[in-house]
C-alpha cells in the first residue's frame, strides 16, 4: 500500500477525521460540503465569531499529496467561504492560513479580522490565543454562545448556497 492510499482512511485520534466521521460535533453543523472539502466552525471553545475550518474529507497531511481534483476544488471553496463570511460579518479582512503543526490533517483556518483590530495575522493569532487561554481559565467573556454559532452558521450557509447556485 502506498502512503497516499493509506491516508484515504480515517486516522484514529485525528480531530478532523473524528469530525468528518460524526464523532465530534461542530457548532452550527456543516456549513458547506462538496465531494472533497468540508466547511464548519472551529470546535469548542469558540471564542471568535466566524472562525471557520475548511478540511479535506479524506485524511491527508501534505498539500503536495492532493489529487488534481481535490486541488482544483479547493480554490472555489476557499473563495466562496471567504465571500460569504465577508458578506455576513463585514470584517476588516479575512485571513486564510494553514499550519498543520497540531492537527496534521490538511485544513485551513478562515479567520475574520474585526474592524478596529490592528492589521496583521500576528495580532489576530495573539488575540485568539489570549481569548482561548482566558476562557480555559474560566473567563467566559469571549465565549460565543450556541445560539450565536447556529445563527451565524445559517447565515454563512445561506450566503455560500447563493454563491454556489449563481
Predicted regions located by residue number:
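HIT superfamily nucleotide-processing domains
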Residues: 1-166
